[in-house]
């Protein structure tokens, strides 16, 4: 079973407008409200793949109940911890081919709630083989909280796929608690290193050889339309993907995480892990809805992905 962790979920609201005018009334022609957050995008894709997945994290208030009901409607199992605060909204205004986002920070998590969630994980870890940890930390949680969570997962011999950035990721990399996989994009990798990084294979290879990444089994760097560059142990791979028509790239990284977790769950080899990860990211980009894939095109696309050891 794959357990997905979303500590700062949201209700994602999309407003579709023909025109977006400031300082006046805008009439919405179409609106959608769905359970959101990076980890729940991962969850939906895994569910669509047919993998055995359970979602966990922190939910509070009526908005938290809305997310539970939304997952129930999709027949996705979940075991969230209830908190005192109200789960947040994230609003996307789609207008004239553009997207304007308004993101709430979310509830403040108390120390008691933070400790309770780690205890909650101890009770549900046994059934899981793979843990995905995605997204930002909500207010109240220290920057080393993911490191504490990963340390707990390691104690239970669980593989962890981590998708976060900034201080939360830096704190993990500096700790003794190492995840199995991290998936930075080139911008996030640049922020970690503190200097610009090009698409040069030699530069990417030397970057991933730095001590900062020691102890991490897989480092998979997303390069957007250029594919990916990956390090697995002492092996390095260049992933080349075909050109596709991109409808909505939001959530493609989450779909990629789902592919990594699924490949680990099914014990795929390096080449097929990288292919599954990348094809799911591409399939998500071809859909209007975030965290959705159309498996009709799976074989057609995956057959065009090239993985080369370098």
Curated annotation (Swiss-Prot):
SUPFAM superfamilies named among the record's database cross-references: Ribokinase-like
EC class: transferase
Catalytic activity: D-tagatofuranose 6-phosphate + ATP = D-tagatofuranose 1,6-bisphosphate + ADP + H(+)
Gene Ontology CC annotations of this record: cytosol
GO MF annotation terms: ATP binding; phosphofructokinase activity; tagatose-6-phosphate kinase activity
Keyword entries, A-Z: ATP-binding, Kinase, Lactose metabolism, Nucleotide-binding, Transferase
One of the GO biological process terms: D-tagatose 6-phosphate catabolic process
The keyword tRNA-binding is assigned to this record: no
Pathway note: Carbohydrate metabolism; D-tagatose 6-phosphate degradation; D-glyceraldehyde 3-phosphate and glycerone phosphate from D-tagatose 6-phosphate: step 1/2
Domain of life: Bacteria
Signal peptide region: none
Keyword check for Cell cycle: no
EC number: 2.7.1.144
UniProt cross-references to HAMAP family, sorted A to Z: LacC
Entry's family note: Belongs to the carbohydrate kinase PfkB family. LacC subfamily.
PANTHER family tied to this protein: 1-PHOSPHOFRUCTOKINASE, 1-PHOSPHOFRUCTOKINASE-RELATED
Protein name in UniProt: Tagatose-6-phosphate kinase
Species this chain originates from: Streptococcus agalactiae serotype V (strain ATCC BAA-611 / 2603 V/R)
């Amino acid at each position: 079973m794959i357990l997905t962790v979303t500590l700062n979920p949201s209700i994602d609201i999309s407003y579709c407008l023909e025109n977006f005018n400031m300082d006046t009334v805008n009439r919405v022609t179409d609106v959608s409200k769905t359970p959101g957050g990076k980890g729940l995008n991962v969850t939906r894709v895994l569910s669509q793949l047919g993998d055995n997945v359970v979602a966990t994290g922190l939910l509070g208030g009526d908005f938290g109940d809305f997310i539970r009901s939304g997952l129930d409607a999709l027949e996705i199992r979940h075991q969230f911890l209830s908190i005192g605060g109200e789960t947040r909204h994230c609003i996307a205004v789609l207008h004239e081919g553009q997207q304007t986002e308004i993101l709430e920070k979310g509830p403040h998590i108390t120390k008691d709630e933070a400790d309770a969630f780690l205890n909650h994980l101890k009770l549900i870890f046994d059934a899981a083989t793979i843990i995905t940890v995605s997204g930002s930390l909500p207010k109240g949680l220290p920057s080393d909280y993911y490191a504490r969570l990963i340390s707990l997962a390691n104690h239970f011999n669980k593989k962890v796929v981590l998708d976060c950035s900034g201080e939360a990721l830096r704190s993990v990399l500096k700790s003794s608690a190492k995840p199995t996989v991290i998936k930075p994009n080139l911008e996030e990798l640049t922020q970690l290193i503190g200097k610009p990084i090009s698409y040069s294979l030699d530069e990417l290879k030397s970057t991933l050889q730095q001590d900062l990444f020691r102890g991490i089994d897989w480092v998979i760097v997303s390069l957007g339309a250029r594919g990916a560059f990956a390090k697995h142990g002492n092996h390095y791979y260049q992933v080349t993907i075909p050109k596709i028509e991109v409808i909505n790239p939001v959530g493609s990284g989450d779909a990629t995480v789902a592919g990594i977790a699924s490949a680990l769950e099914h014990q795929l080899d390096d080449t097929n892990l990288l292919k599954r990860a990348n094809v799911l990211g591409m399939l998500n980009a071809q859909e209007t809805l975030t965290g959705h894939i159309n498996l009709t095109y799976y074989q057609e696309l995956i057959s065009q992905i090239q993985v080369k050891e370098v």
